[in-house]
A protein has these predicted regions:
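Contiguous, well-folded functional domains in the mature portion of proteins
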Residues: 1-178, 182-184, 190, 194-204
């Protein structure tokens, strides 16, 4: 976490991949570009090493190993969806390095993707990084440009600044960010693929 010059607390979401961060609106899938699941950013990866963007618990892993849901102690829920329509690969090209329930540190390896094999299959490897919950009462900034996995922030979630700027108020805001957990993060990865399929069918029809 970083403290901004105006006294607000910023929760830094690091890039899970080395590459280039681009606006979510540029992702050629309406489920992501229209922010149906959540807001965030997308990464054009240079390699397939997928790391955790935040200290968190692994709350969901897609059966096909292409998507990961995480929840931080502060209630921030993050979903990483490696590539588009990668659910159709049924786990091919992906190697999972964690299991549900694991506690991971920012920068810790979650999975490995065979980027060359994905490109040979003509899979679009653009990877949405979404904030799916825990942002109630908070604002969010996304950043674009070259990024290094586990080092450069791509999203900052800001708590509302305490009126008197006191450290006590800041601490209270962090310890009780929402009062209650957001949507069930354990279903995040499945929800993303169901909504993608539903949207795709509606576009066809």
């Amino acid at each position: 976490m970083n403290k901004n010059t105006d006294g607000c607390i910023g929760i830094r979401i690091l890039s899970p991949l080395t590459g280039t961060a681009v606006p979510l609106e540029e992702v050629p899938d309406p489920v992501f570009s229209q922010k149906i699941i959540g807001d965030g950013v997308a990464i054009l990866p240079q390699d397939g090493n997928l790391v955790s963007p935040i200290d968190a618990e692994v709350v969901s892993i897609a059966e096909t190993l292409h998507a990961y849901g995480l929840r931080s102690e502060n209630g921030i829920e993050v979903m990483i969806h490696f590539g588009l329509e990668t659910v159709a690969l049924k786990g091919e090209c992906f190697q999972c390095c964690v299991k549900v329930g694991d506690k991971v540190k920012a920068g810790e390896l979650l999975a490995k993707a065979d980027l060359k094999a994905l490109e040979e299959k003509q899979v679009n490897t653009v990877t949405p990084v979404l904030i799916c919950g825990g942002t109630e009462g908070r604002s969010m900034n996304a950043f674009t440009g070259p990024v290094k996995a586990g080092t450069d922030a791509v999203i900052t979630v800001l708590d509302h600044c305490p009126p008197d700027g006191t450290a006590e108020a800041e601490t209270a805001a962090l310890q009780n960010p929402d009062g209650a957990p957001a949507a069930n993060a354990s279903s995040l990865t499945d929800t993303a693929d169901r909504k993608t399929e539903k949207t795709r069918k509606s576009l066809i029809n």
